[in-house]
C-alpha cells in the first residue's frame, strides 16, 4: 500500500470505531469546548489501533500535545499509526513487527516530548521513565495504567519504594474490568483464535489458564462455542468459582494431557512449560491472552523442537518429535496480534475512564503511588453508557436512602 492508501485505510477504521464509541464522543465534545488539557503534553504507550486512536484524538481535542508508541511489537496497525501521525498535535512512533530495541526507541521518542501525564498499557513507559529517563520525573503530574499486568508491576514498584509518581489504576475501575476484561477479552480472544486457525471449537477440550476476569470471559465464550472447558488456577477461591460455574478444574499438568486448545490469561509467566508440551495431544493449539509473551515458555518449546515452520498466517508449528504444537502469534497477545482487539463498544468505557482520569490528574495534585479511579468517574461512565443504550434505571427514594444509612430498623 502507498502512504496515502495507508492513511485512508486508517481513517476508515477510525471512523468506524468513532461511530461505535458514544461515551467518549460526549467526553470529546466537552473537551473541545473546555480545553482542560491546554498546554499539557501526554505521552502514551498503548496498542495502536482504531479505538486507541479515538482516545488519542479526544486528548488532543482537549488541548494536549500527544505522542504515542506501541505497547506490544505485534499489536500496532500501521495504517492507523500513519493516519494518527497526520493529525495536528499528535505524533505516532509505533510500527508493527518492530524488534525489542526499536520498540524501546519508540518509547524514548515519546518521552522526548517531556510529558506531563503518561498513559501506559503494561507499564513499559513508566519502567523506562524510572530506569533511564529519571530527569523527567519531577515534571510528571501523574499517569494512568490500562491493564492488569501493568497494575501488578506498579504495585510491586510501590511496595519497593521505587514508584516516584502518582498513577491511576484505570484497570481497576468497575466500568473497565467488569466489561473490558470479561466481555472484551472473551470475545476478542476467540475472534483472534478463530480467524487465525479456522478450526471448529465445538466438541474440543479447551484449557483456560487462570480464572480472573479475563479467564472468565474466555471460558464463558468457549462454552458458548460448544467446547468442553477446563480451568486451571492457583487461587482456591477462583478455582471453586470456576467449578461452580460448571467447568472442570484441575492442575495444568493434568489438563495438558487433555487440551486441544490452550488459552493463557493469568498475567504471570511459565503457565505452559516443557513438562506440559511433552504430554500435549498432537496438534494442540496454544494462544496467550495475557499482556506479555511470557505465559507460554517459547524458549523451552523452541529448544524441544526438531523443526519449526509456518503452517498458516500467524501460526507456527513446533515439531517436538512425537507430536506437533501450534502457537498463534508467537505467544503474544492473541486478540491484538491476531485480531483487531476488543469491540469498540467495550473500549468506549475503558478509554472514557482514561480520558477522564487524565483530566483528573491535570486538575488535582496526587501523592506518589497507585490510586484507584475516583468513584464519581466510574459511575459517570456507567451512566453515560446506559444513556447511549437508551436505558433508564431507578433511583433511591429518600426513605430508601435513610433506611440504607440507618441502623434502628430491625425485625
UniProtKB/Swiss-Prot annotation:
Cleavable signal peptide: none
Residues annotated for NAD(+) binding in this entry: 147-149, 181, 210-215, 233, 268, 289-291, 335
Cofactor(s) of this protein: NAD(+)
Keyword Nucleotidyltransferase: no
NAD recorded as keyword: yes
Keywords: Cytoplasm, Hydrolase, NAD, One-carbon metabolism
GO-annotated biological processes: one-carbon metabolic process; S-adenosylmethionine biosynthetic process; S-adenosylmethionine cycle
Co-factor remark: Binds 1 NAD(+) per subunit.
Pfam families: AdoHcyase (PF05221), AdoHcyase_NAD (PF00670)
EC annotation from Swiss-Prot or TrEMBL: 3.13.1.9
GO cellular component term of the entry, any: cytosol
Binding sites annotated in the UniProt record for substrate: 121, 146, 176, 180
Pathway(s) annotated for this protein in UniProt: Amino-acid biosynthesis; S-adenosyl-L-methionine biosynthesis
Extra remark beyond the main annotation: SAH is a product of SAM methyltransferases and is known to be a feedback inhibitor of these enzymes. As a result of this inhibition, organisms have evolved efficient enzymes to metabolize SAH via different pathways. The pathway found in methanogens differs from the canonical pathway, it uses the deamination of S-adenosyl-L-homocysteine to form S-inosyl-L-homocysteine for the regeneration of SAM from S-adenosyl-L-homocysteine.
Family per record: Belongs to the adenosylhomocysteinase family.
Protein name in UniProt: S-inosyl-L-homocysteine hydrolase
Name of the gene encoding the protein in the UniProt record: ahcY2
Amino acid at each position: 500500500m502507498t502512504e496515502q492508501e495507508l492513511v485512508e485505510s486508517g481513517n476508515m477504521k477510525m471512523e468506524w470505531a468513532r461511530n461505535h464509541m458514544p461515551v467518549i464522543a460526549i467526553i470529546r465534545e466537552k473537551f473541545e469546548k473546555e480545553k482542560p488539557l491546554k498546554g499539557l503534553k501526554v505521552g502514551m504507550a498503548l496498542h495502536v489501533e482504531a479505538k486507541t486512536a479515538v482516545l488519542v484524538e479526544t486528548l488532543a481535542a482537549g488541548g494536549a500535545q500527544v505522542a504515542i508508541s506501541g505497547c506490544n511489537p505485534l499489536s500496532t496497525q500501521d495504517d492507523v499509526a500513519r493516519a494518527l501521525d497526520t493529525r495536528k498535535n499528535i505524533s505516532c512512533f509505533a510500527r508493527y513487527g518492530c524488534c525489542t530495541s526499536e520498540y524501546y526507541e519508540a518509547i524514548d521518542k515519546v518521552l522526548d516530548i517531556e510529558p506531563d501525564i503518561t498513559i501506559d498499557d503494561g507499564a513499559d513507559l513508566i519502567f523506562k521513565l524510572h530506569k533511564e529517563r529519571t530527569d523527567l520525573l519531577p515534571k510528571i503530574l501523574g499517569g494512568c495504567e490500562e491493564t492488569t499486568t501493568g497494575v501488578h508491576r506498579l504495585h510491586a514498584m510501590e511496595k519497593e519504594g521505587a514508584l516516584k509518581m502518582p498513577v491511576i489504576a484505570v484497570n481497576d475501575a468497575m466500568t473497565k474490568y467488569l466489561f473490558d476484561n470479561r466481555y472484551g477479552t472473551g470475545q476478542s480472544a476467540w475472534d483472534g483464535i478463530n480467524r487465525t486457525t479456522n478450526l471448529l471449537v465445538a466438541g474440543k477440550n479447551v484449557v483456560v489458564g487462570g480464572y480472573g476476569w479475563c479467564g472468565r470471559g474466555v471460558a464463558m465464550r468457549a462454552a458458548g462455542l460448544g467446547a468442553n472447558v477446563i480451568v486451571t488456577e492457583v487461587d482456591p477461591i477462583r478455582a471453586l468459582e470456576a467449578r461452580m460455574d460448571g467447568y472442570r478444574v484441575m492442575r495444568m499438568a493434568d489438563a495438558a494431557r487433555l487440551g486441544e486448545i490452550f488459552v493463557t490469561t493469568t498475567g504471570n509467566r511459565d503457565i505452559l512449560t516443557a513438562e506440559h508440551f511433552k504430554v500435549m495431544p498432537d496438534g494442540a493449539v496454544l494462544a496467550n491472552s495475557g499482556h506479555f509473551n511470557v505465559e507460554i515458555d517459547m524458549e523451552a518449546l523452541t529448544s524441544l523442537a526438531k523443526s519449526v515452520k509456518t503452517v498458516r498466517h500467524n501460526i507456527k508449528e513446533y515439531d517436538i518429535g512425537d507430536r506437533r504444537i501450534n502457537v498463534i502469534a508467537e505467544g503474544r497477545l492473541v486478540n491484538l496480534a491476531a485480531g483487531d482487539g476488543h469491540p469498540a463498544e467495550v473500549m468506549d468505557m475503558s478509554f472514557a475512564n482514561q480520558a477522564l482520569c487524565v483530566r483528573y490528574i491535570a486538575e488535582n495534585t496526587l501523592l506518589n503511588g497507585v490510586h484507584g479511579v475516583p468513584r464519581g468517574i466510574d459511575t459517570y461512565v456507567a451512566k453515560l453508557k446506559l444513556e447511549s443504550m437508551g436505558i433508564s434505571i431507578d433511583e433511591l427514594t429518600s426513605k430508601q436512602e435513610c433506611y440504607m444509612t440507618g441502623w434502628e430498623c430491625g425485625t
